[in-house]
């Protein structure tokens, strides 16, 4: 099922499968989200929960039992309950049930996704709650993975675009092995850079996971017109940029994360792995990604 909201600038459609934004159009009716061509990348803007990236060994252990887990968790692959779709807001919820705890993740949780339109900005808030009746603490990872159409129109090509910071940056890049797990190494790709030129080969070796950014915003800009899609990444310890290795580039992802993918040296025990947060029963945690579409 899908729900749609709109204002004078934006029309947003969210699917209950994965609580995923699947369409965002501007006032001219131009589609700004990637439309999930399965030959290139079959998603639009998935939610990453309860982990980001890959698990070491594709598994984790909790309470003496081993669980298998795919990339980026499972929230993106499940049906969420639509709570509200009116005015400028869409809200959905995913609750752990007995089957989920037996097969996927043995912890109680409530994940609430709230989309709100404000002018040309989409605010997407993720709230994680450990229910008061839960038997144990909740450890989790979480992140965003929106994909934006590039080029913005047929008159432009890949080289007409660049990523821009709002101040000079020398981001530390966390290196990943070919298997997608962090290697434990890091390097510097750009120094004192205000921008990163987009090319068809930029992501030939996969994504760039940037740590320690000081910038409040990171956006993709059309150089000759100034049109842009800009994400507020303030407060996120890690921000990734990525696109599938298709030529020419068809979309770019700007991905603020509160957790890292698995590392080659990670323990199997879930309680020993790094997490976004650890919530005692009755506690909750939330984050918001605000993205402005000036195009």
Task: Please provide the spans of the model-predicted regions.
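Active-site/ligand-binding surface loops and adjacent short beta/alpha elements
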Residues: 135, 139, 147-234
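Short Pro-Gly-centered flexible turn/kink motifs
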Residues: 14, 60-68, 126, 277-294
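Asparagine-centered strand-capping/turn motif at beta-strand->loop junctions
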Residues: 14, 128-132, 243
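Acidic, contiguous internal or C-terminal segments within carbohydrate-active enzymes
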Residues: 101-153
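Extended, loop-rich substrate-binding clefts of extracytoplasmic carbohydrate-active enzymes
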Residues: 70-119
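Acidic-aromatic substrate-binding/catalytic surfaces of carbohydrate-active enzymes
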Residues: 8-66
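Acidic/His-leaning functional-site neighborhoods
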Residues: 10, 26, 72-84, 193-274
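Short, Gly/Pro- and small/polar-rich lid/capping loops
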Residues: 1-8
């Amino acid at each position: 099922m899908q729900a749609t909201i709109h204002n004078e600038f934006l029309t947003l459609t969210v699917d209950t499968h994965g609580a995923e934004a699947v369409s965002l159009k501007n006032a001219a009716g131009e589609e700004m989200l990637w439309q999930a061509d399965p030959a290139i990348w079959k998603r639009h803007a998935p939610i990453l929960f309860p982990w980001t990236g890959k698990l070491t060994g594709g598994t984790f252990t909790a309470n003496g039992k081993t669980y298998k887990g795919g990339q980026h968790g499972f929230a993106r692959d499940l049906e969420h309950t639509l709570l509200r779709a009116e005015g400028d807001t869409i809200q959905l919820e995913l609750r752990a049930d007995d089957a989920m705890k037996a097969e996927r993740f043995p912890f109680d949780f409530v994940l609430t996704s709230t989309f709100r339109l404000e002018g040309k900005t989409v605010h997407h808030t993720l709230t994680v709650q450990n229910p008061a009746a839960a038997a144990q603490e909740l450890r989790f990872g979480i992140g965003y993975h929106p994909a934006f159409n590039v080029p913005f129109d047929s008159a432009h090509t890949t080289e007409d675009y660049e990523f821009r910071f709002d101040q000079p940056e020398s981001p530390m890049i966390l290196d990943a092995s070919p298997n997608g797990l962090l290697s434990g190494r890091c390097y510097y790709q750009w120094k004192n850079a205000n921008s990163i030129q987009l090319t068809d080969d930029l992501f030939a070796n996969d994504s760039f996971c940037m740590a320690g950014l000081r910038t409040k915003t990171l956006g993709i800009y059309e150089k000759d017109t100034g049109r842009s899609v800009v994400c507020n990444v303030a407060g996120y310890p890690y921000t990734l940029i990525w696109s599938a290795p298709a030529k020419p580039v068809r979309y770019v992802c700007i991905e603020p994360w509160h957790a890292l993918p698995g590392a080659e040296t990670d323990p199997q025990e879930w309680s020993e792995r790094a997490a976004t947060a650890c919530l005692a029963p009755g506690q909750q945690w939330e984050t918001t990604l605000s993205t402005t579409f000036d195009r």
